[in-house]
A protein has these predicted regions:
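Active-site hotspot residues in diverse enzymes, especially metal/ion-binding acidic/histidine motifs
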Residues: 1-240
Length: 240
């Protein structure tokens, strides 16, 4: 499979988004995942119970694969997922829980798998990996052990959060070119505006914080640990 850099994936996203804009006849306030997936790769979605633990959020296959996956259930029944490259199954708990951001990320993530499969049909060999599962995590771990998922996550962020929309909402919300401190405890006003930005874009705050960080649009990012500025560590004398 190809090892694509962030710059490679950004170039792909620009081409795909340009194509999407030419197929749409409306002003873009956010990327509509369902419309995007249908227009770009003819992908449709169905909601189902993906796993008992909720650890799997999505399931799809490449375009030239036709298969059925059988998943045993705790009550002795078996649930079947029919995959043909035109459908992606998404865990229905995402919709039931009202988690719009995670739902939208998962929908575009499944479309991103299809896009990479179409661009690199030999490398993304469907006979070697006939189907793809999306796990319940928007963050990429390092060192990277699964390049397929890392590349798909990065491409998803570029597609769902294009620079133009980010710049637009940063300006509209008065955040300027950079959020100096992203911290819900010590910078509540900026954090509230950041949260509103995530709502308008239809993404989770986690996904938005990662994207802004990668763009250099956050000075100090305390999203994951708002009490980081006041952590006090006792020295050996104090603990004696």
């Amino acid at each position: 499979m190809p090892i694509l850099s962030r710059k490679d994936l950004e170039r792909i996203s620009r081409r795909v988004l340009f194509r999407y804009l030419t197929l749409s006849d409306r002003k873009m306030d956010r990327i509509d995942p369902i419309d995007f997936a249908e227009k770009i790769c003819g992908l449709h979605f169905a909601f189902a119970d993906m796993s008992v633990t909720g650890s799997i959020l999505g399931l799809t296959s490449y375009s030239d694969v036709d298969l059925t996956i059988s998943v045993p259930r705790g009550n002795g029944s078996v649930q079947e997922f029919h995959l043909n490259g035109n459908i992606a199954y998404v865990d229905q708990n995402l919709a039931n829980a009202g988690s719009v951001g995670r739902l939208n990320f998962t929908l575009v993530h499944e479309a991103a798998h299809q896009i990479l499969g179409m661009l690199y049909p030999e490398e993304y060999n469907p006979s070697a990996q006939p189907f793809i599962c999306r796990l319940a995590d928007e963050r990429s771990t390092y060192p990277i052990t699964d390049w397929v998922e890392w590349q798909t996550n990065v491409l998803t962020a570029y597609l769902l959060l294009p620079r133009e929309l980010i710049d637009r909402y940063m300006d509209e919300l008065g955040l300027g070119r950079q959020i100096k401190l992203l911290n819900k405890v010590f910078a509540p006003k900026e954090y509230a505006l950041f949260s509103e930005m995530a709502r308008r874009l239809g993404v989770s705050k986690t996904a938005l914080s990662i994207r802004l960080d990668n763009l250099g649009m956050i000075g100090r990012n305390d999203f994951s640990n708002p009490y980081a500025p006041i952590h006090i560590y006792a020295d050996d004398f104090d603990t004696a």
